[in-house]
């Protein structure tokens, strides 16, 4: 035990990457390795990288260069390792191993081989692995919240997206496996489970022959957990049955993360999402009718090649009309290896930046209005942090997802990791403010 090296993990990227990080930590701890939060003291640093867009790659490269300059032994995992395996080994002598997105479960074996002097390249050409409830896991989120992956990979081929190349085709877990992991998380004190995959509404299509999201939600409804939240609902997959399951299952929050990407049919066709333009409005209206309290989050890409001022104004009008609760806006990032990389009529970065600014400026008063509607209500809040200086508590209500949405700043007494009633007395564009209601 004592002679095994210590390992630190630097986590970058999305919550799917976070789950991979947590499984690697779990496997290393189970194998007797010491895990150190201090990268300077650790013998090895695993950098779980992101390669989704250029900005994410730059952050990953900065982290790798800083560690290389500090002469750390680096194990590179994640999407960048899958994407640029040869290049990374050539350019970073300090990299002792690269491990692909479908190979992180071999991390203990990789470290053992490195310890014997091998420089390891463990990258499957086509990632096929998916962890389940039997895979060790060491959670890194706050005590009350956990991500639960229902599927990995993606069968869609949106023109701007490199994810299928980096994470493979969709592979779903069984309903039984997901429910078993949910039960494990409840036993650890988790109060909120966030279901994730690339397209959660396509869950089960590969193993059951048709999407089974509705059945999954109903099965999770029998688990003793207060909040179940769903990320990444592809709009065309929100069938009447899926919406009914959200309606009927009390612990499933009426929170829908719909990555719409654009509103105009021309741009959606160019994005290789041709069917979406016909259904955007109808699905949003159907959700609002069936789930009047639904919280809607979406993301848009501005500056996709060929986006004219007319296309952009269509998007502005769409956002103004539908009044989403939360909106994320990205400028188009031209990714080598995607169809969009070679499209004509690429827009200048300053035009894209200006459009992003305009769309965010349009959304801010809408977000403010939506938050303002919470003032005067008593809402359940999951308490996650305490400010040691002021004693103020920080948490989230059901309308806020971790990291991407706002927070609730709370006065009063409550234990971390518990859900308590809070009277909301103030709101701003992104956050809410309130007082614990003592029974």
Swiss-Prot record:
Residues 372-438 form the TRAM domain. Signal peptide: none annotated. The keyword Transcription does not apply. SMART domains: Elp3. CDD domains: Radical_SAM. Disulfide bonds: none annotated. One of its GO terms (cellular component) is cytosol. One of its GO terms (biological process) is tRNA modification. GO terms for molecular function: 4 iron, 4 sulfur cluster binding; aspartic acid methylthiotransferase activity; metal ion binding; protein methylthiotransferase activity. Residues 5-116 form the MTTase N-terminal domain. It is found in: Cytoplasm. PROSITE patterns: MTTASE_N, MTTASE_RADICAL, RADICAL_SAM, TRAM. [4Fe-4S] cluster 1 binds at residues 14, 50, 79. Its cofactor is [4Fe-4S] cluster. Keywords: 4Fe-4S, Cytoplasm, Iron, Iron-sulfur, Metal-binding, S-adenosyl-L-methionine, Transferase. Binds 2 [4Fe-4S] clusters. One cluster is coordinated with 3 cysteines and an exchangeable S-adenosyl-L-methionine. InterPro entries: Elp3/MiaA/NifB-like_rSAM (IPR006638), Methylthiotransferase (IPR005839), Methylthiotransferase_CS (IPR020612), Methylthiotransferase_N (IPR013848), Methylthiotransferase_N_sf (IPR038135), NA-bd_OB-fold (IPR012340), Ribosomal_uS12_MeSTrfase_RimO (IPR005840), rSAM (IPR007197). Its EC number is 2.8.4.4. The keyword Calcium does not apply. [4Fe-4S] cluster 2 binds at residues 154, 158, 161. Catalyzes the methylthiolation of an aspartic acid residue of ribosomal protein uS12. Belongs to the methylthiotransferase family. RimO subfamily. This is Ribosomal protein uS12 methylthiotransferase RimO. It comes from Nostoc punctiforme (strain ATCC 29133 / PCC 73102).
């Amino acid at each position: 035990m004592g002679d095994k090296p210590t390992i630190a993990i630097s986590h970058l990227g999305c919550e799917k990457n976070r789950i991979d990080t947590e499984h690697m930590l779990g496997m290393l701890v189970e194998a007797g390795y010491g895990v150190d939060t201090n990268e300077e003291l650790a013998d090895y640093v695993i950098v779980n990288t992101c390669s989704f867009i250029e900005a994410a790659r730059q952050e990953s490269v900065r982290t790798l260069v800083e560690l290389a300059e500090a002469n750390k032994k680096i194990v590179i995992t994640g999407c960048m390792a899958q994407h640029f395996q040869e290049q990374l080994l050539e350019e970073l002598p300090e990299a002792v191993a690269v491990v692909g997105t479908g190979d992180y479960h071999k991390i203990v074996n990789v470290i053992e081989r490195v310890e014997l002097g091998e420089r390891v390249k463990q990258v499957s050409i086509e990632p096929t692995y998916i962890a389940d409830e039997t895979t060790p896991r060491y959670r890194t989120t706050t005590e009350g919240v956990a991500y639960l992956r229902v599927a990995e990979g993606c069968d869609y081929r949106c023109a701007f997206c490199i994810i299928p190349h980096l994470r493979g085709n969709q592979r779903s877990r069984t309903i039984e496996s997901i429910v078993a992991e949910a039960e494990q998380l409840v036993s650890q004190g988790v109060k909120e489970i966030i279901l994730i995959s690339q397209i959660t509404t396509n869950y089960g299509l590969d193993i059951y022959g048709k999407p089974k999201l509705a059945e999954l939600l109903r099965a999770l409804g029998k688990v003793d957990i207060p909040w179940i939240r769903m990320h990444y609902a592809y709009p065309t997959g929100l069938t009447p049955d899926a919406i009914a399951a959200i309606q009927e299952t009390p612990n499933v929050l009426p929170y829908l993360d719909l990555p719409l990407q654009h509103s105009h049919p021309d741009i959606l066709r160019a994005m290789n999402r041709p069917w979406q333009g016909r259904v955007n409005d109808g699905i949003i209206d159907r959700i609002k009718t069936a789930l009047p309290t639904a919280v809607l989050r979406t993301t848009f890409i501005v500056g996709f090649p060929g986006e004219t001022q007319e296309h952009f104004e269509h998007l502005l009008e769409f956002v103004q009309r539908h009044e989403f609760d939360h909106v994320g806006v990205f400028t188009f990032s031209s990714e080598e290896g995607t169809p969009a990389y070679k499209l004509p009529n690429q827009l200048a970065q300053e035009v894209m930046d200006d459009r992003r600014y305009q769309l965010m400026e349009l959304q801010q008063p809408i977000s403010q209005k939506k938050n303002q509607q919470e003032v005067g209500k008593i809402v359940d809040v999951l308490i996650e942090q305490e400010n040691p200086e002021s004693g103020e508590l920080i948490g989230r209500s059901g309308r806020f997802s971790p990291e991407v949405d706002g927070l609730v700043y709370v006065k009063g007494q409550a234990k971390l990791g518990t859900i308590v009633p809070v009277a909301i007395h103030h709101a701003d564009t992104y956050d809410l403010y309130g007082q614990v209601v003592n029974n």
